[in-house]
A protein has these predicted regions:
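Sec-dependent N-terminal signal peptides
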Residues: 4-13
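Small beta-barrel nucleic-acid-binding modules, primarily SNase/OB-fold domains
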Residues: 15-139
């Protein structure tokens, strides 16, 4: 089912200007949430994990206390930007490297690009793939 959902989403939103509505169900961490994607004029709803495109936030199961603290704040901040139960929009949907998850530009209720907000507020870093930079400072 997940393969079909991702294929459908990629086909439906091949134009960058088209937005797909999503109801936020659960914040997972600072750059990932579970959302109910509304398909077919609001008739069908499918749950999917969405990773905010172009941003990297610290990991909750991080390598040091500082990373874990920052990760918990990033999760809280994402929840403030896109509260559970609200309807937001996603654009530029792409397959994620992990099965069952998609990457997308995420826009809050005010139309702000959530990834850009997280980077601007220094809650996350710009990320375009590849090796992630560490969040822990080595002595």
């Amino acid at each position: 089912m997940e393969k079909y959902l991702i294929a459908f989403l990629l086909g439906v939103v091949c134009l960058e200007v088209q937005a797909t509505p999503v109801v936020v169900k659960k914040i997972i961490d600072g750059d990932t949430f579970i959302g109910d994607v509304i398909l077919a004029d609001g008739i069908e709803v499918v749950s999917v994990a969405v990773r905010v495109l172009n941003v990297d936030t610290p990991e909750i199961h991080g390598e040091c206390e500082d990373e874990i603290r920052k990760a918990l704040y990033a999760k809280q901040r994402l929840g403030e930007l896109i509260p559970e139960g609200t309807t937001i929009e996603i654009k530029n949907i792409k397959n994620d490297k992990y099965a069952g998850r998609i990457d997308a530009n995420v826009f809050d209720g005010a139309g702000r690009d959530v990834g850009l907000v997280l980077v601007k507020e220094k809650v996350g870093r710009s990320y375009s793939g590849g090796k992630r930079q560490p969040w822990c400072v080595l002595d």
